[in-house]
Amino acid sequence: FMALATLAGHAPRFQVGEPWWWTMPDGRICLYDDAAKAAFGGTPVEIPTIRSTTLTAAQKALLDAAGALLAGSTAALVNAVRLDHPGCEALILVYLPTVLDAAAPDAKRANVPLGWASPAFDVLQLEDYDWVTTGNVGATAHGVAAAEARLGYPVSKQHYLSGFVLLETDRAQWRPIDAATDAARKRGVAATFIWALPQVLRDGYTHFDLAEDDVQAFDDVSFPL
C-alpha cells in the first residue's frame, strides 16, 4: 500500500494504528500465549487482573517487559517501511480510553511503552471518542496531559482524532465531537480528524469557524454639536 500511495504522488506516511496488548473484559491482559511466554522467559508471573492498584514489583516488571516488546515490534514495522521508503513519516495512533484506563494505572507500562517516546515517531496521534461522546471533558484533558508527559511529543507534533457517530439515532454526538475538535485546535495540534465520510454525509455534519473578530467597542471621535 505504501507503493500505491507513492505511485499516486503522495508523500510516504506510515501509521501504526492502536497497537496494544489486549485486555479481557474481566481485566486479564493477554500475555500468555506460547510466543509471549517464550519471550518473557517461559513462566511469566500471573496477573489475574490489570485493573488493580496493588500489583507486585514482579507483575509491574512483566508489564514493562511487555511494553518493551511492543515498542520493539512497532519500531521493526517502521524500519521495514523506511528500507523501501527512506524519509517516510511515521505516526503512532494511541487510543487513550483503553491504554490509560483509570482503573488500571499500570496498564501504560505495557500499552504506552517508553520506547514510543519522542523521537521514536514523527507524529503522536491521540484518539478518545468514547470519552468525547459521553461528555467526559475531564478525562480527555487528563489523558492528553498524561500522554504528553509520558511520551514527550510537543503539541506541534500531535494529531487529534475526535470521533465519529456510528448510528443515526446518536447524531447528537456530533456536538461534543465538534467541541473536542475546537479544543484540540486551541491546544495547537498540527491536525484534527473527524470521520467517516458516510456518517458525515448521512447526518449532514458541517464544521463552521464562526468565531467573531475582535472589534473596537467605540470610535473615539469628537463630533461637533
PLM feature spans:
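Substrate-binding cleft/loops of secretory-pathway carbohydrate-active enzymes
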Residues: 84-134
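Polysaccharide-binding and catalytic clefts of secreted carbohydrate-active enzymes
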Residues: 1-84, 95-112
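A structural signal for short, well-ordered beta-strand segments and their strand-loop junctions
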Residues: 13-17, 89-93, 192-194
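Substrate-binding cleft of secreted/luminal carbohydrate-active enzymes
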Residues: 12, 121-138, 143-225
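A generic short-segment signal for beta-strand/edge and adjacent turn/coil regions
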Residues: 59-60, 91-95, 160-163
